[in-house]
Amino acid sequence: MGLTAIGDTLIASGHPGRTTAPELGSPNLGIIRSDDSARSWSPVSLTGEKDFHALAAGPDESLYGLASDSIELLRSDDTGQTWSPAGEVVAVNLAIDAAGQLFAATPDGLQVSADEGATFTTVNDAPLLYLLAASPDSKRLVGVGNGGQIWVRPASGAEWVPAGTTHGSAQAITITNGGDILVFDQSGLTALPR
């Protein structure tokens, strides 16, 4: 399942649950959105067709997604209504920084694209991450490595620094504009103040 936000709008994808409204799609949700803090959802596009495992929104409201059925990176400039191919990358997670650079957590290490996903290069000296997220203002990045180490890039171009560890495997992580980290792992939701 992928989840991201564009302003106050939540954009998500995945598989329907037992209580999911039929109009949201099956066997895949495609792109769905919520404008009321996830109280209700409506279909946007690719209903029943795609399951995006990774979604990321940029500061310019561009949206990138990796579907579970291919390595093709897709891009949308209209909050997910239409999609076009951007490039290819084998990744488990995506994030976009304030400069518009697209980061991909790949099995071979962190990669970055400065050309809207057309090409990717390896980020030297970056940790190997399986979770990756950007702060709402896109100035900070946070990630989790295979050993449970939490890493933060506090500003564009800055070095990655360790910021703590998870309790077992983590399923989700985020960072606030102020630098506070929220991680959901085997012990539940934990806040790591900066």
Give names to the regions the model predicted.
Residues 1, 47-52, 88-93, 125-131, ...:
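Short coil/turn segments at the loop-to-beta-strand junctions that recur within blades
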Residues 5-8, 57-60, 96-99, 135-138, ...:
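Residue-level detector of Asp-centered blade-edge/turn motifs that repeat once per structural unit
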Residues 16-18, 47, 69, 108, ...:
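Residue-level signature of beta-propeller blades and closely related beta-rich strand-turn architectures
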Residues 12-14, 65, 104, 143, ...:
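Residue position within the beta-strands of beta-propeller blades
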Residues 27-45, 74-85, 111-122, 148-149, ...:
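Asp-box/BNR beta-propeller loop motif
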